[in-house]
């Protein structure tokens, strides 16, 4: 879900924090990509006659098709992608996951009715709502990335948090995801629509975290509280408080505790046993791997390995797979070209005078499994 209404709020109150551009603008950049979000996009978008692509055994291959060609597109535009996969979801997310399961049950019932009635449009709509990224989808995508020579990271917990940690640690330039909570985790740069197909003609949106805080006149802690008020994956929000009211309350009281002390509870319903404090800690100190211990290597593709993996039972066209492997190999020759700004030292941005001095805590750190470089190499 991400953060409800945050992108529109930023567009309204801090428009200078967002810029739109083409994919080629990120030539020479290393980008951490939310893998689950990508696979979900591919499972929904890569279809034939309303159904997902499958192997001869009926196994879904849409996610592999999307990963292969979309990654090649990124590489051809000079981007070095690293895919970050979700680990175990935090306990606080159980409520959100239950809601999603209930929605899928409702979609299944609606699909059964649509199938019985023979309404093709509704069948396609409810089929898409039933899409879920499984562990098998993720494992198959990881094997494909290894054969392509593209690194990936197994996050110990939330992928967006790990992406943000890689950005803050200087390992990559940005986080690429559609979920706005990458900003709540503190990613300096968030890219949306980076992995969309060319056919959709959607410009890449680049969100700048420091400029967002400047535009909203908030500290990092206040921004996290704002995101919790807007609605996140880890706890309910106060019923009746929309985006504008949330900003107004944070600007006036600065913390959720102060808001609760002054809130008109007859007008606004506070969730029972509201665990906003645990959600706050999760955003401030997420369970992530130490970026310094994450090694990222981009290697050469294993053409024969790709043909063996994707053709045959999975029914990919061999000529196209070989052509794709050659495209990846060709990008290696341009990979040595850096961006002009990489030759200069980047000075830290001038801090907003309204931002307070905050207690800097080191995030809880775990080892992440990483792979890449030589094809076929197993995660450590």
UniProtKB/Swiss-Prot annotation:
Q: Where is this region: Disordered?
A: 342-380
- Write down the EC number: 3.1.-.-
Please name the GO terms of the biological process aspect recorded for this protein, alphabetically: base-excision repair; DNA replication, removal of RNA primer
Q: Binding positions for Mg(2+) 1?
A: 34, 86, 158, 160
Q: Which residues participate in Mg(2+) 2 binding? A: 179, 181, 233
Localization recorded for this chain is:
Nucleus, Nucleolus; Nucleus, Nucleoplasm; Mitochondrion
Q: Which cofactor does it need?
A: Mg(2+)
Q: Which residues bind DNA?
A: 47, 70, 158, 231, 233
Query: Which top-level group of life is the source organism from?
Result: Eukaryota
Record field: compositional bias (Basic residues): 363-380
Q: What class of enzyme is it?
A: hydrolase
Family as reported in the entry's similarity comment: Belongs to the XPG/RAD2 endonuclease family. FEN1 subfamily.
**Any idea what this protein is called?**
Flap endonuclease 1
Q: Which organism is it from?
A: Aedes aegypti (Yellowfever mosquito)
Lineage, opening ranks: Eukaryota, Metazoa, Ecdysozoa, Arthropoda, Hexapoda
Per the record, the gene is Fen1
């Amino acid at each position: 879900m991400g953060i409800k209404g945050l992108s529109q709020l930023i567009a309204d109150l801090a428009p200078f924090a967002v810029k739109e551009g083409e994919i080629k603008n990120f030539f020479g950049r290393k980008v951490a990509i939310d893998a689950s979000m990508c696979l979900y996009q591919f499972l929904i978008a890569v279809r034939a006659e309303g159904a997902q692509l499958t192997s001869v055994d009926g196994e879904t291959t849409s996610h592999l098709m999307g990963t292969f060609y979309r990654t090649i597109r990124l590489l051809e535009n000079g981007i070095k992608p690293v895919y970050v996969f979700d680990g175990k979801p935090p306990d606080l997310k159980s409520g959100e996951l239950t809601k999603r399961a209930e929605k899928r049950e409702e979609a299944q019932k609606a699909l059964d009715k649509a199938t019985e009635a023979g309404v093709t449009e509704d069948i396609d709509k409810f089929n898409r709502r039933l899409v879920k990224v499984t562990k098998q989808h993720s494992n198959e995508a990881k094997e494909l990335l290894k054969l392509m020579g593209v690194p990936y990271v197994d996050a110990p917990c939330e992928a967006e948090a790990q992406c943000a940690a890689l950005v803050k640690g200087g390992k990559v330039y940005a986080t690429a995801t559609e979920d706005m909570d990458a900003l709540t985790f503190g990613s300096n740069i968030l890219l949306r629509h980076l992995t969309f197909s060319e056919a959709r003609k959607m410009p890449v949106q680049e969100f700048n975290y420091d400029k967002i805080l400047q535009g909203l006149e908030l500290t990092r802690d206040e921004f996290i509280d704002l995101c919790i008020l807007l609605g996140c994956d880890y706890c309910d929000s106060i019923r009746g408080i929309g985006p504008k009211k949330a900003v107004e309350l944070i600007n006036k009281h600065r913390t959720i505790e102060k808001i609760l002390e002054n809130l008109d509870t007859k007008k606004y319903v506070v969730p029972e046993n509201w665990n906003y404090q645990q959600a706050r800690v999760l955003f401030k100190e997420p369970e992530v791997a130490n970026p310094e211990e994450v090694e990222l290597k981009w290697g050469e593709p294993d053409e024969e390995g790709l043909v063996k993996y994707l053709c045959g039972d999975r029914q990919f066209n061999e000529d196209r797979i070989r052509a794709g492997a050659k495209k990846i190999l060709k990008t290696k020759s341009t990979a040595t070209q850096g961006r002009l700004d990489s030759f200069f030292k980047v000075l830290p941005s001038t801090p907003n005078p309204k931002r307070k001095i905050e207690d800097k805590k080191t995030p809880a750190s775990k080892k992440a499994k990483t792979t890449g470089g030589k094809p076929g190499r197993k995660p450590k």
